[in-house]
Each structure stands twice: as C-alpha cells, then as structure tokens.
Amino acid sequence: MNGFAVIPSVTTTTTSGEPIAGDVARKQNLLELNREGLERFFENVLGEKRYRAHQVMKWIHHRYVSDFEQMTDVGKALRARLQACAEVRVPCVVFDKHSADGTHKWLLAMDTDSKNAIETVYIPDKGRGTLCVSSQIGCGLNCTFCSTATQGFNRNLTTAEIIGQVWVAARHLGNVPHQQRRLTNVVMMGMGEPLMNFDNVVRAMSVMRDDLGYGLSNKRVTLSTSGLVPMIDRLSTESDVSLAVSLHAPNDKLREQLVPLNKKYPIAELMASCERYLSVNRKRDSVTFEYTLMKGVNDKQEHAHELVKLMRQFDCAMQVKGAAKVNLIPFNPFPGTYYERSTEVDIRAFQKILLDAQILAMVRRTRGDDIDAACGQLKGQVVDRTRRQAEFRRTIEDRVGRDVAA
C-alpha cells in the first residue's frame, strides 16, 4: 500500500474552497486548498503570515511530504498547531501496474472500504511525461464507446482527490519541479467529465500551474470535455488551459449515437463555444478535437470529408489557419463492447484526407493497452448510483445468450 493511509473524507471548506475559520474539530486537508485558500487558512485559522503557507505548500507539492514533523523549516509550535487542525491526506494506492511500453497505471482508493477507486495513468515519451487525471468516480455521461461509462456514476472527486493523483504520481516518479521534471503535462482525460465537476477541477488545475505547486505552464495542462457548452463558456472566464473536445463524429445524427450529450448541445453550438473560448483566451491559438476511429462506424471517407468541412469552418471563424487540430484515436476495446478498432489502412486513409486538406491531424499512438490503461479503457471501481452497470451486464449476457443459441 506504499504507506498511504486512507482516512474518511471530511469537508472543512466552503464551496469555493475557502477554509472555514475556527473549525478545528475536523482537520482541514491541505490538499483541498490552492495558494489563496492556503494563505487564508494560515491567516484566519492559524494567525500566521502568508509566507508560512508558501513554506508548507512547497513541502507538500515539491518534496511530497505529508508529515508536518518533517517540515524542518517550520517552527515547532506551528507544526504542533498544524497537527491539531490540519492534515495532508492523499489517496491510497491499491495497486500499480506497468506496461511493456513504460506506461504506468495506479488504482487509487477514495474511500475507507476501497469500493470506490479511480485510475490514473502516466505516459512517458521522448522529452515529456504526461499524467492522465480523473475528475469523477465513474461518469455522469453515457458515451457508448467508453469503458468508464459502463461503470455508471458515484460522485465528483474533491479538489484533494484530484490533485492527490498528481501528488502520488509525482512522488512515485521522483519529480522535482523546476529541476528534474518527470511530469511535464497533465491532461484531464481520465474517468469522468471534468466540466461536471467544475469548481474542484479548476481549483486543482490552479495548483498544477502554480510555481508553489507543480509549476506547469497553462499550455501543458489540458482539459478534455464531451461538450458542456455553458461550462466551456464559464471556463473561458476562469482559466486559460488548453482545451480538447471529444468530438468523435462529424455530424449530429452520428454523434448523438456515440455521445448522447449531443442531443442537448449539438455540434453547431459546441463549435461556437470553442470559438468563444479562443476569442477570450488569446494566449490559446487552437482547440484539439478528439476523434476515436471505430470500424465501420465513423471511419469512412465521407466522414473524413465532413470533418474537413467542419474544421475549415472553425479555422475560418477564428481567422487562424490551424485553429482546429484533430487527434485521431484508434479505438481501444474493452470487455463487452461491440465496437472494433479501425484497420491501420483505414486510419491512415482517414488521416490523409485531413492532411491533404491542410488540417493538422495526428494519430495518437496506443499506449498501455496491455494493462487497460489506454484511452477509453479506464474504469476503476465504482459503487454505481445509476443502473448503468446492471444494464451493461444484462446487455452482455443477452449477447452471449444469442451467440450460444446460434
């Protein structure tokens, strides 16, 4: 278990993440706070100067120390007060798996009984290391090609549980911000829809980008969404991280089958919200559109030509060539799915149509599929509050029954 103890989660912050002054009966998890929240906690609860908060924040996020007694440049009296009213509570590592290609996956327990757990994935590459972080236990959406969707939904993760994934991974990797950086990028592409957990995700991303936290630049933190249009608009006013959109289809009819959220926010509205996002965040010059290729579903040449038209319209609206970038993702199978991965020939043919039209299109190399850590394969352990798990099991049983009868 790597020495990470699980303690029942308690809330000692307001909905905005501010510490509740004077509430020392319950310990404040300092991972729940960004720099501003930690400064307020030290001023209002501990009666200390703000620079003390900065000292502790560095101990937590630069040196991965969770025991106040080990924070040697913090006075003994202050350490004692911190022990009485605060803690650094991190997720518990249930197991970790290594892929043959270097990918690393952790199953992290969020509750004392380990019935709820999420998955976090580290993907090393030449000159970079990317951490794929989860935002929910399960997912409230029901995308038909995603393993997480089959698990149903339990709840949103807290800020501490989100940034705790980064803490666990960075500690394991021996990451040293500003020096020996093993973790160079974070993508909010794990379990869950990040924009359905807006406040906690935005607060966690602020710690990722803070020099007292993990020191990542805005462009190295990417949020991926299935297309919650109002929340994309809100994100544009509260953060300027890189934006990725799970598109997966070039027209509404097909996208509604793959991403049911499209019935509420169709492609035209989604693309308009992406235009507004770039208009507000002038530092960002592009949006990445993710497109999972499934055999015979969305990988035909006519789909590629439709996608070209959609991407060109976006570039034209932004008056920037290359404002739309396409990330082609070969489908990663999971038990019970009826989708199949497109052939390599079809994937390359699809990409060529985009490239010939001068649309930047990359094919994402599949990583970690031997440990079910590839895109779309994460599922964790979810105590489902919906009926989706049971419905998925019945679907599989019915399919197996038909196959046996045949």
From Swiss-Prot:
GO molecular function, one term: metal ion binding
Species for this entry: Xylella fastidiosa (strain 9a5c)
Known role: Specifically methylates position 2 of adenine 2503 in 23S rRNA and position 2 of adenine 37 in tRNAs. m2A2503 modification seems to play a crucial role in the proofreading step occurring at the peptidyl transferase center and thus would serve to optimize ribosomal fidelity.
PROSITE patterns in the record: RADICAL_SAM
Cofactor(s) needed for function: [4Fe-4S] cluster
Primary residence: cytoplasm
An annotated GO BP: tRNA methylation
Pfam families named among the record's database cross-references: Radical_SAM (PF04055), RlmN_N (PF21016)
UniProt binding sites for [4Fe-4S] cluster: 139, 143, 146
EC number(s) on file: 2.1.1.192
Binding site for S-adenosyl-L-methionine: 192-193, 224, 246-248, 332
Note: Reaction proceeds by a ping-pong mechanism involving intermediate methylation of a conserved cysteine residue.
Protein's UniProt name: Dual-specificity RNA methyltransferase RlmN
Underlying gene: rlmN
Cofactor binding annotation: Binds 1 [4Fe-4S] cluster. The cluster is coordinated with 3 cysteines and an exchangeable S-adenosyl-L-methionine.
Record NCBIfam families: rRNA_mod_RlmN
Catalytic center residues: 119, 375
Cellular component per GO, a single term: cytoplasm
Residue stretches in coiled coil: none
Family of the protein in this entry: Belongs to the radical SAM superfamily. RlmN family.
Location(s) in or outside the cell: Cytoplasm
Domain Radical SAM core, chain residue ranges per copy: 125-370
Taxonomic lineage of the native organism: Bacteria, Pseudomonadati, Pseudomonadota, Gammaproteobacteria, Lysobacterales
UniProt enzyme class: transferase
PANTHER family from the UniProt entry: 23S RRNA METHYLTRANSFERASE, RADICAL SAM CORE DOMAIN-CONTAINING PROTEIN
Substrates-to-products reaction catalysed: adenosine(2503) in 23S rRNA + 2 reduced [2Fe-2S]-[ferredoxin] + 2 S-adenosyl-L-methionine = 2-methyladenosine(2503) in 23S rRNA + 5'-deoxyadenosine + L-methionine + 2 oxidized [2Fe-2S]-[ferredoxin] + S-adenosyl-L-homocysteine; adenosine(37) in tRNA + 2 reduced [2Fe-2S]-[ferredoxin] + 2 S-adenosyl-L-methionine = 2-methyladenosine(37) in tRNA + 5'-deoxyadenosine + L-methionine + 2 oxidized [2Fe-2S]-[ferredoxin] + S-adenosyl-L-homocysteine
Family matches, as InterPro entries: Aldolase_TIM, Methyltransferase_A, RlmN_N, RNA_MTrfase_RlmN, rRNA_lsu_MTrfase_RlmN/Cfr, rSAM
Disulfide links within the chain: 132-375
Tagged with keyword Protein transport: no
